[in-house]
Amino acid sequence: MTVFPGGPPQAEAVLRDAVAMGADDIYLVTDRAFGGADTLATSYTLAAAISKIGMPDLIFCGIESIDSNTAQIGPEIAATLGIADVSGASFISFEKEGGLIVTRQNGSSAEVVELKLPAVVTVLPELNKPRYSSIKGILGKGDAELHIITAADLDIDTARIGIKGSPTQVKRVRPVVPPQKENLRIEEKDPQESVDILIEALRKISVI
């Protein structure tokens, strides 16, 4: 199993944790030239890196990142490499003939998809629980060779990477302030009068 994200040098710590959990090889696709990339430029870069180390039978991607939540990287890698893709996988079984049967979530329903390898599968968190790191893995993770891939290592069009290759750019991020709800305070001492006021207020907002 090979683990390989795109990210800053600080991602090395996560990769070494992956070794402790059983990963065989770790790669880090990192370069200042990749900075500011949107999903299109990122997937192009990762697809080029995958092609460099050799096409695997199966590529797993998380369904989405926790920052932009686009869920586009996996499908775009598949499109760039020209291989099959299934998104939102919640269960996977392997066929003897070298294919996959994938259960994917589609809103409130589920679909069962059969596909041939090589393929990209983007997975939901509930697909599997990560294994615990072994003592041997923890002790040996610092000795694992980390392979660094930079822009100079790839056969790519530099106009398609980083911020230059990104047709979409984030100009501003601002919090969404939810509308304030109007509060109702009933100060009448008579219980029946208080109930009448409450009922009338609920009718005005179509609750009853």
What would you call each of these model-derived segments?
Residues 1-208:
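N-terminal glycine-rich FAD/FM-binding segment characteristic of electron-transfer flavoproteins
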